[in-house]
Amino acid sequence: MASPQPPFGGGSNSNSNTASPSNNLSPTASPLLEGRDSPNLPLTMTASTVLMTLPRDATAALAEAGKFGQEKVVIRFKPVGSAPALRREQVKVSSTERFDTVMTYIRKTLKCRESDSVFLYVNSVFAPALDEVVGNLWRCFKDSTNQLNVSYSMTPSFG
């Protein structure tokens, strides 16, 4: 009759690094190693619930988030350096237009050639991307008079 072995492999013939198939104390397989089809995989909070439709409150909030407070916003142009001044220093632009519309307007008004450079800066601080929406820029960077200040220059002016 075989003598019972201690639970942690204290026998003379046992190797402490390998588990025998008859040992019931071996750990269960890790859920990460079982495969993707295993139903025992833990789910994150975002993956545990699938929403087929959004609740009415969320749908209304998302619809309102894309709208702008004003249909048109006022942009005030300020020349920097040797850039010529514009006749109309303020213009109204649709809040849904992209910033490249503003660039096109400035280039046309200043009668720039294709090879001429024009640099635009919001609040004399940064140059926004041309695909940025004017309404978003106005919402984030308007001044106390509800105008978006755009400086323009023929040479790079601000960092």
Swiss-Prot record:
Start-end of Low complexity biased regions: 13-27
Compartments where found: Preautophagosomal structure membrane; Cytoplasm
Membrane topology according to the record: Peripheral membrane protein
GO biological process: autophagosome assembly; autophagosome maturation; autophagy of mitochondrion; glycophagy; piecemeal microautophagy of the nucleus; protein transport
InterPro entries in UniProt: Atg12, Ubiquitin-like_domsf
Phenotype upon gene inactivation: Displays slower vegetative growth under nutrient starvation conditions and leads to the inability to form fruiting bodies.
Chief place of localization: membrane
Cross-link (Glycyl lysine isopeptide (Gly-Lys) (interchain with K-218 in ATG5)): G159
CDD domains per UniProt: Ubl_ATG12 (cd01612)
Record-level GO cellular component terms: Atg12-Atg5-Atg16 complex; autophagosome membrane; phagophore assembly site membrane
UniProt keyword Transport, yes or no: yes
Signal peptide: none
Residue ranges, annotated region (Disordered): 1-40
Keywords for this protein: Autophagy, Cytoplasm, Isopeptide bond, Membrane, Protein transport, Transport, Ubl conjugation pathway
Entry's transmembrane regions: none
Gene Ontology molecular function: any one: Atg8-family ligase activity
Subunit structure: Forms a conjugate with ATG5. Forms a thioester bond with the 'Cys-116' of ATG10. Interacts with the ATG7 C-terminal 40 amino acids domain. The ATG12-ATG5 conjugate forms a complex with several units of ATG16. The ATG12-ATG5 conjugate also associates with ATG3.
Family: Belongs to the ATG12 family.
Purpose of the protein: Ubiquitin-like protein involved in cytoplasm to vacuole transport (Cvt), autophagy vesicles formation, mitophagy, and nucleophagy. Conjugation with ATG5 through a ubiquitin-like conjugating system involving also ATG7 as an E1-like activating enzyme and ATG10 as an E2-like conjugating enzyme, is essential for its function. The ATG12-ATG5 conjugate acts as an E3-like enzyme which is required for lipidation of ATG8 and ATG8 association to the vesicle membranes. ATG12-ATG5 rearranges the ATG3 catalytic center and enhances its E2 activity.
Protein name: Ubiquitin-like protein ATG12
Lineage, top ranks: Eukaryota, Fungi, Dikarya, Ascomycota, Pezizomycotina
